[in-house]
Structure formats: structure tokens, C-alpha cells
């Protein structure tokens, strides 16, 4: 009864299990689609979470990163049990093998997936199915493709390349990511055929399942035996223990496999990240490529495409613009021609006026040259005549000195004879005090009127003396018969207070100034002359001066006073003629004798002055004229004891000349120059600048015989200035030719 109960229970259990399995399969078929969708979403979330964790780890310090890695490993060690689907139990005979059960291989992931509730297997078939499902993970791989990938990766030429390039190449060849991972694992482990261990495990599990099935059949057949039941229970316990051990071994293998997968996933993710990182080289390359393409397109469109499309319009516009430009240029050319013609006409008019001015200037220059040549010739002639005249004047002065001495002696002798012959007197003269006064002339005239002239004796010679004074500068003195005062030894002009009109020093050089010899030389010469009348001097021709020393203004205030600059020169002519007249008898009159004695005393006191007449000469055209008048009323006769009847006539001419030259200007306006040429040379040697020399021009010679012209240059004279260059430089060649042609036609 016990065995029957057990069998019935087993049958009931099997039926219940089959029913449950059928229900579960239906439910699983409905929920597989939902599970796949959930897995896809969870994988996306896990990828996001992994990226965030990596970013956080990169930002954290290295010590904290190591601590977190250790915690992650500890958390990943407990792994969920593998999902195992129940299978339907079929009735089979004792000699037949159980049919192959459908195996479902769950995809392993890092995250825990919610699984349906699992029931503990009641038979050995469930354990064999679990072990089969665990130990066959590579049923979805294509072994041929995996082996080819392993051979490719083991190639020595490929080992040195980057892993990202290897993975990309294998994916191009058609391998899935799982196959690539499997190939990489086999390359790392060195096992080309990675299914050996799995096959050995599978064979062991199959042998165990067969033994279980055999035992299970025997138990059913021998249910009546209690001993067999006890043995079966013990055997079940042993099988359960072995099964637990196998599960633990499988779990360790699965954990190691999961770790490898995680490491591979991390490597692949890093490679993908490296490929997706931003690189400046690629950015610059792309930017340059875009810019080059854009510039090329712009060039093509602007130069080829647009002109090709708008060819007709552009040609028309260009032709219209060219016509406008040509018309504007023609108008400008016409305007320029008109302006050039106007300027040419204006220039011709200006050149005509300039030509007239140039001709006038040339005429003035020629006149100045002629005047300069005439002045040089006249100056040379006057200098030669002056030198000859000075020599003649000196000779005449010597003759005058001799005559004056002879005349003084003769007057003394005549006075003595008059005193002895009783009332034989001579004419009375007034002294000359430097200024010819009218009172002296009146006195002379009264004396001449009151004088009684005795007839000359026939045996006595008659002496007539005529003195002529000539002033060479043009004067306003009338040609009247006036007596000339005698030559005095002292300076008759000491009482005058005349000075130069300015405070400047005299301009006349030293060699041209008045000599410092006093007029006392004349007295010395008079003393040396012999007082005899028997040897008269040889007659000389009266001299007429032919040069001009001044003008009428040399006399101060328009009066008849003489100037200091005038040099008195006297010329004396003596002629002796025989007289056939009878001597007149002297009249005896006491009154007249007394008067004559007084007159003789006055004559002795006045140094026996002679009767002279002043004749003024006008020197306007460098031709002097000497006009002399003799005063016959002043003739005196004296008896002589000699038998010779001779008459001695002496003519004295006094010429007063001026020391100023013809071309002298006003003395106050001239600049003072040095009086000595040697002083000027010494000043130049010492580096000084004498007066009258310009200092604003630096033309000192250098060592190389060149002259350094400073910035300060002498301003150009009007005839030296070139005023036409500024006008002619702006002319064209045609205008200059037309002007030259007009000049040649005008000259013809």
C-alpha cells in the first residue's frame, strides 16, 4: 500500500507540475516581448549612469577613486541565480533516453533583472537542464567568424595597431559586438578553440542525468522495496550535494566571465570616448575646408557665373559709360585749348611790355657806361693837369718871394729918398686883416685923390707894379678895381669861429690836407733875398688856373671872407721899359711934403704894401679865366741919379685856390675811412674789419681754393634779377617757338 500511495502521489505531482509548466510557458511567451523592451530601456539608463560616474571620478582626487573601485567590486560579487525555465515531463520507456529539453540562455548584464519566481526542481532532469544552460554560453556565436577574427588579431602586423581601429575593422567585416568580444578574450587567454571546457562539463552533466534517469526508473519499478527507497533518499542527498557544488563552481566561472565582460565593456567605452573627443586639428581642418570652398564658390560666381548670366546688360552699360567718358574728355580738351590760347595772348602782351622795359634798362646802362668812361677820362686829365699846375705854382711862389724881398728894399730906399728930396710922397694903403672891408677901399681912394704926383724925371726909371689875385672857385665877387692887402706872417683867421657842420672827424685824407708849415717861411725867404734893384728877376708869364677847387659857397655867409681850405698862390711879372719922357720938376709944397712923409711912415709900418687888384674868375666848365685890372692911379715916380732912362713895371698875381675837388660831396654824409693804407692792411691781418667793409658776407677762401658762401648773400640789383624764368618755365614748347618767331619778325 505504501508503494501504491507513493506512486499515486508521484503521478499527481507530475500532473500538477505539467499543468503548472504549461501555464508558465504561456505566461512566459506573453511576457518575453515586455522583458526585451525593459532590457533595452535599462541598458540605456545604465549607459547614462556609467558616463556620469566616469565624469565624477575624473573630477574626484585619485585616493577617493581607489576607495570607490574597491566598494564596487564588493557589491558586484553577489550575483543573482540564473533563470531556469521548467520543462514538460514526458513519459518514456525504461530503455529510451529522455528527449532533449529546450534551453533558454539568459543574457548576462551588470544590473539585476527582475525574474519570475523559480521552483525547486523535483527531479534530476531539472538539474541537468540548468547545468546545460549554464555551461553553453557560446551557442549564439559563429565559430568560423570568431576563429577568423582571432587569427586576424594574432597577426604580428596587426598587434601594434590601435584597438579602436581593430574593432572598427572587424565590425566592417560583419562581426557582432559579442563575437568581437569573444575573439578579444580568446586572444588574451591564448585559446583559439574556447569550447573545450564547456564540452567536458556538458558530457559530465549528461552522464549524471542518465544515471539519475536510470535510478528513477528502477525506483518506480521497485517501489515495493523499502530498502531501495532509503537508498534512493541517500542517493538523492548525495546528488543534491554534488549539484550544489557544481552550482558553486558554475557561479565562480560566471563571475569571472562577468568581470571580463565588464573590463571589455569599459575598454570599448573608452575607445569610443576617445574617438568622440573634440580635437582642434579636425576643427581647424574642417573650418579651412569650409572657408576654401566658400571663397572658391564666391570667386566663380562673381567672375564667371554672374557675367555669363548678365553678359548683354554689362556690355550695354560699359559702352554707355565709355561714350560718356569720351564726351566729357572732349569737352575738357576744348576748354584747355581755349585757356591755353588765352594764356598765350596774355603772355605775348606781357612779353611786349617786358621787352620795352628791358630795352629801356639797356639804354640806361649804356648811358651810365658812357658817363663813367667820360668821368674816368676827365679825372685822369684833371689829375695830370693838377700835377703839372702844382709844379708851376711852386716855381712861381719862389719867384714871388724873391720879388717881394726886392720890393721891400726898393721901398725903403724910396722912403729915404723922399725924406731927403722934400715932399715926394707915395700912395697910402690900408692893412688887410683877413677880411676885405669897404672902409679900407674908401681910405685908399681918398689917399689916391689927395695924392700929388710929381712928373717923373727923364733920367730915372719908372717902375710899375701890378698884383692880381685870382680865386679859382666860382664866386660872386664883382670885377672891380680894388687894392689887395699884403701877405702877412701871422694867421689872419684866428679870430673866426667857423666850424664843420657836423661833429664827425674830417674826411679829407692826410696826404690831401693842408700843410703844417707856417707862413713864416715867406719872411725867411724875404730875408734871404738880395735888396738890389739893379738885377731884376726874369719876367714870367702870368699863370691862368684851369681847374676848379670849389664854388661860391666857399665864402662864409655869402660875404667876401676867405676860407681856410683855400691856398693863396701869387704870381709876379716884372717888365722894364726905357722911358724917353722928360723928368718933371718936383713941386715944392710944405703941406704936401708933410703928407708924403706921413704916408711914407704909414707905408713903412705896413711893410710897403703894393697896389693890387682882385679879379674873380668863374670856373663853371673847368675853364678858368683870369681877368686882371691895373690901377694906374697908384703909380709912383721917384727921381734917380742914374743916367739910364728905364721904367720897371712889376705885375703880381695872387691866386687863391680851394683844396676841395670837383667830385667831393658833402663832408658830413660820407663815412670815415682810415687815413693810412697800411693801417687798413694791418687791421685786415689782425682779423679786424675796418670801417666801410661789409661783414655780412663770408667769402673767405679755404685750403682747396674754394669759397664758402654763407646764407647771407648780397641782394641782387634790379638788372641782375631774373624775373622772366618764373614765367617762361610754365610755357610749353609750342608757345616758346611762337614767341621766338614773333621776336624774329619784330627784329626784321
Curated annotation (Swiss-Prot):
One MF term in the entry's GO annotations: signaling receptor binding
Residue spans of biased composition, Basic and acidic residues class: 43-59, 710-723
Location of region: Disordered: 1-138, 190-228, 406-673, 685-748
Source taxonomy: Eukaryota, Amoebozoa, Evosea, Eumycetozoa, Dictyostelia
Name by which UniProt lists this protein: Peroxisomal membrane protein PEX14
Compartments where located: Peroxisome membrane
Biased composition (Low complexity): 7-30, 122-131, 190-209, 218-228, 409-424, 445-476, 528-542, 569-611, 628-661
Superkingdom in the source lineage: Eukaryota
Coiled-coil ranges from the UniProt annotation: 8-60, 241-277, 316-413
Keywords from the UniProt entry: Coiled coil, Membrane, Peroxisome, Protein transport, Translocation, Transmembrane, Transmembrane helix, Transport
Membrane-topology annotation of the record: Single-pass membrane protein
Similarity comment: family membership: Belongs to the peroxin-14 family.
InterPro entries membership: KPWE_PEX14_dom (IPR040554), PEX14 (IPR025655), Pex14_N (IPR006785), WH-like_DNA-bd_sf (IPR036388)
Membrane topology, Peroxisomal segments: 1-277
TM helices/strands, residue ranges: 278-300
Cellular component GO terms, alphabetical: peroxisomal importomer complex; peroxisomal membrane
PANTHER family: PEROXISOMAL MEMBRANE PROTEIN PEX14
Gene name of the encoded protein: pex14
Its biological purpose: Component of the PEX13-PEX14 docking complex, a translocon channel that specifically mediates the import of peroxisomal cargo proteins bound to PEX5 receptor. The PEX13-PEX14 docking complex forms a large import pore which can be opened to a diameter of about 9 nm. Mechanistically, PEX5 receptor along with cargo proteins associates with the PEX14 subunit of the PEX13-PEX14 docking complex in the cytosol, leading to the insertion of the receptor into the organelle membrane with the concomitant translocation of the cargo into the peroxisome matrix.
Cytoplasmic side: 301-748
Quaternary data: Interacts with PEX13; forming the PEX13-PEX14 docking complex. Interacts with PEX5 (via WxxxF/Y motifs).
Organism: Dictyostelium discoideum
Biological process terms in GO annotation: protein import into peroxisome matrix, docking; protein targeting to peroxisome
Polar residues bias: start-end ranges: 86-104, 510-527, 612-627, 724-748
